[in-house]
Design a protein with these regions (language model features):
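Long, internal scaffold/assembly segments composed of regular secondary structure
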Residues: 293-404
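Structural motif
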Residues: 116-123, 127, 195-205, 246-253, ...
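Blade-level signature of beta-propeller repeat domains, shared across WD40, Kelch, NHL, RCC1
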Residues: 526-556
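Loop/turn-rich, solvent-exposed surfaces of beta-rich toroidal or solenoidal domains
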Residues: 354, 408-513
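Repeated scaffold domains used in trafficking and secretory/extracellular systems
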Residues: 93-103, 139-150, 168-183, 223-233, ...
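Asp-box/WD-like beta-propeller blade repeats and closely related beta-sheet repeat scaffolds
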Residues: 154-178, 195-197, 203-236, 258-289
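Residue-level detector of Asp-centered blade-edge/turn motifs that repeat once per structural unit
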Residues: 104-107, 184-186, 234-237, 294-297, ...
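Sequence/structural signature of beta-propeller modules
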Residues: 31-160, 554-556
């Protein structure tokens, strides 16, 4: 076992006095009013007063990136969903996030979404597109286009389908991760990353939900900030936080007038690693390839290739100095490509406070790190690479002989429960390159030859400070969906496949029993690596293959 390495940041930041920030956060949160995330007796993080006052103002739900809610989701008996229970908009591929606004003066809300080609604003109640801002001049994507694409994914031999799927994937997703993670602030500004900066969009007419979309402001990296934007978040005192794939952390004022940046520890590894990934044509596999989590005390958490790291913001300085509370801890990385998960924070009351990822081993392990002080006399789990590791459990989906399992999804955190899914294709075509398996679980995820099976819950016991497997369900399929948990309905939700149909699956959070299946339909309802979530009305929303989808299973 290695002791936690001591980082040596450029510039040598001094100690951080965070008491003022904590007090300010409490005051601002009180003034902002209770958000859904504020309830739950310490199970959920405090609402960030600088995000839109809604159930989903940022990817992964909130600044803590937990992918869970106290709001009750669907609990009706399983049944095939009728047309009246399904709403969708044909916006075109690539609209992964669906970000909910605060209420406008008249009580209306809108949903913001984006692709590499456009920014859209939709009516919250109907999903009707209210306004569009074109980034690229492209023909409108139609239902006929959607039908043609869906048919092509089913036609011909396996080789024909694989070739078509590979080509389609290149047109559907951005070349990098810059525009994947977005957020909406309390003033209605929708922030989208670009390769070397960030752009804010908003209403051209203030207070009008049907207003055209205006580009409010753009900011490009100065010469001393390197890399492309990967993750985005916002501190509890209102500073935008960005991570770059070169290993830099950035805080930026919301008017783009002030900026702070720091190199993360071990970022000297990034250039060679990124060059190797580029040479192997592995787009999206850079040294940092997931978004970032932020806590209410100024902690900023990012997972790099083989390293889990914390930077600290105190309102005027950004630091990676251990004396300020920052740290960097190694995690196991046998694949050599790091974690596929965005860090998720766990523990918000007076109990244990942890940050959770899956590691980079071929058989991934859910790995939890102490966010703040490592308890005196702490003995980490056997095999841990740092004293900061609090818990580490391999994900086997109930098969003790399993040797490989990876997921590209964040760990769902609900209280001290953690839910993960299997994203390994059931089989691989002969000669198919393993690094291209995303094609199998995305565009071809409804083919039973490739559909992955398995959902697993782990639980942290704050009394014994141990992590254990709580249950495994091997019936559940979740080819590419980012799952979601509702403590209000005691369910974990995902979108999988049953009998060729994309299907909403509801699993009891306490027991792992598959409580209900709601078949939806064909390729249009493929989640395509988007996250699902529960809105305040208890409906499921996600980004489908051809546009946003909303589900409201009713009692038959």
């Amino acid at each position: 076992m290695k002791n936690e390495p001591k980082s040596k940041p450029p510039g040598g930041q001094g100690p951080v006095a965070i008491a003022v920030l904590i007090a300010l956060t409490a005051l601002l949160t009180a003034c902002a009013g209770l958000r859904p995330a504020d309830s739950g007796g310490g199970l959920f993080p405090p609402g960030n007063p600088f995000l839109a006052d809604s159930a989903y103002p940022i990817g992964h739900t909130n600044s803590a990136q937990v992918d869970s809610t106290p709001v009750a989701g669907p609990s009706a008996a399983g049944h095939r969903l009728a047309e009246t229970e399904v709403a969708f908009a044909t916006t075109g591929p690539g609209h992964l996030a669906n970000i909910i606004s605060s209420k406008y003066p008249g009580g209306k809300r809108v949903i913001w979404t984006n692709s590499p080609h456009d920014i859209l604003k939709m009516d919250y109640d109907t999903l009707k597109v209210l306004a569009a801002y074109e980034i690229e001049d492209r023909p409108a994507f139609t239902d006929a286009d959607a039908d043609k694409m869906a048919a092509s994914l089913k036609a011909g031999s396996v080789i024909d389908r694989l070739k078509y799927a590979g080509g389609a994937a290149r047109t559907m997703f951005p070349a990098d991760l810059a525009s994947v993670y977005t957020m909406l602030d309390r003033d209605g500004r929708y922030y989208v990353g670009s390769a070397h900066g960030i752009t804010a969009y908003g209403d051209a007419i203030a207070g009008d939900p049907a207003s055209p979309i205006a580009l409010k402001q753009s900011w490009s990296f100065p010469a001393d900030i390197k890399g492309a934007v990967v993750g985005i978040n916002i501190t509890y005192d209102g500073w935008i936080v960005l991570a770059t794939d070169a290993g830099m952390m950035v805080t930026l004022s919301r008017d783009f007038s002030q900026v702070h940046s720091v190199w993360l520890p071990h970022s000297d590894e990034a250039p060679a690693y990124n060059a190797r990934m580029a040479a192997e044509h592995r787009s999206g596999y850079n040294w940092i390839r997931n978004s970032i989590a932020v806590d209410a005390e100024g902690g900023i958490y990012v997972a790099a290739n083989g390293w889990m790291e914390k930077a600290v913001w105190n309102g005027h300085d950004l630091s990676v100095d251990p004396t300020a509370g920052a740290w960097a801890a190694p995690y196991a990385n046998g694949t050599g490509t790091g974690t596929g998960s965005t860090p998720a924070l766990m523990g918000f009351g007076h109990g244990d406070r942890l940050v959770v990822i899956t590691d980079g081993e071929p058989l991934m392990r859910v790995t939890a790190f102490w966010r703040n002080q490592v308890p005196a006399g702490w003995t980490p789990p056997q095999g841990a690479l740092s004293d900061r590791v609090a818990g580490m459990v391999p994900v086997t989906m109930g098969d003790p002989q399993r040797r490989a399992l990876q997921s590209e999804q964040a760990v769902v955190v609900a209280g001290y429960d953690m839910v993960v899914v299997n994203n390994e294709p059931a089989t691989m075509p002969p000669g198919f390159p393993p690094r291209a398996k995303a094609v199998l679980i995305s565009l071809l995820g409804d083919d039973p030859a490739y559909t992955p099976h398995g959902m697993e819950k782990l639980a942290w016991n704050p009394a014994t400070h141990k992590m254990d497997v709580a249950w495994v369900n091997t019936e559940v399929t979740s080819p590419n969906c980012v799952p979601y948990a509702s403590i209000g309905s005691n369910m974990a939700y995902t979108v999988g496949v049953k009998n060729g149909d994309w299907t909403l699956e509801a699993v009891r959070l306490d027991t792992g029993v598959l409580a209900a299946e709601y078949p939806i339909g064909g390729a249009r309802f493929n989640t395509m690596f988007s996250g699902i979530y529960v809105d305040p009305e208890g409906r499921i929303i996600y980004g489908g293959m051809f546009g946003p989808v909303r589900l409201k299973p009713a009692s038959p």
